[in-house]
Amino acid sequence: TVLCGSDKYPVKDPFVELVKGSLNTFLNAMTYPEKTIYPIASCNDKDFQNLMSVYMDAVFHPNIYKYQEIFQQEGWHYELESEDAPVTINGVVYNEMKGAFSSPDDVLSRQIMTSLFPDTTYANVSGGDPLHIPELTYEEYLDFHRRYYHPCNSYIYLYGDMDVAEKLAWMDEAYLGKYEAIGLDSEIKLQKPFEKPIEVTHKYSISSTESEENNTYLSYNTVIETALDEKLYLAFDILDYALVSAPGAP
């Protein structure tokens, strides 16, 4: 929702405007259980600076504090199509997550993470569970942004043929230097190993025309070291591609 306009760029959807009018070679925003990233790239230095300005302003000065409608549009709100119609819940992310929760593959992937890492942030769904999204209030939403969308809780990477010192000085003067340091512990502790194997059974929805027969998923999951072991991570990435993802994989 931070990409729905900001103090300096009060347009409804700056992302769409950048896609249409910039020289970017990459432009996106992605959410994960433990982070959200806002990557940009351009071969033109002036364009890259413009992209930096739009994204920094979006992250640190979004219009969400001015317009509750952004939360209602992207998160959730009640709708009534007519006086006789039932009250329904609508919202961009809410509808996206309803779709994700109706996909057996997505349901299985979430259950794998939840069962392996129940005591960590990886047990959570970054987009939210549609059953619980309507429980989120506007005030809680703003409090989350104030606490976590802070320079002390961010990593900013610059890479390429540029004057890095100039970029850092601009970021400090325009944004980072205007914040006070806060104590924020973002460490993600490792999941405590289980004392014995655990079995989990979970139901997923099917259409009225589908049969329950031969429609069961079985998954065996185990934790192997951490993603910080680069060689092991790469080895299993290759193994996954060879056994599962590659054309003709068994």
Which residues does each PLM region occupy?
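M16/MPP (pitrilysin/insulinase) zinc-metallopeptidase core fold and M16-derived inactive scaffolds
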Residues: 1-57, 61-62, 67-70, 102-106, ...
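Structured mid-domain segments that build the active-site/substrate or prosthetic-cofactor binding neighborhood
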Residues: 206, 216-250
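Acidic/histidine-enriched alpha-helical segments
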Residues: 35, 62-96, 163, 183-197
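Histidine-acidic residue clusters that define the catalytic metal-binding segment
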Residues: 95-155, 175, 189-190, 226
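Second-shell loop/turn segments in exported
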Residues: 2-5, 36-43, 76-81, 130-131, ...
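Short, solvent-exposed loop/turn segments at the edges of secondary structure
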Residues: 20-22, 31-35, 88, 117, ...
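An aromatic/glycine/proline-enriched structural segment found at the starts
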Residues: 155-216
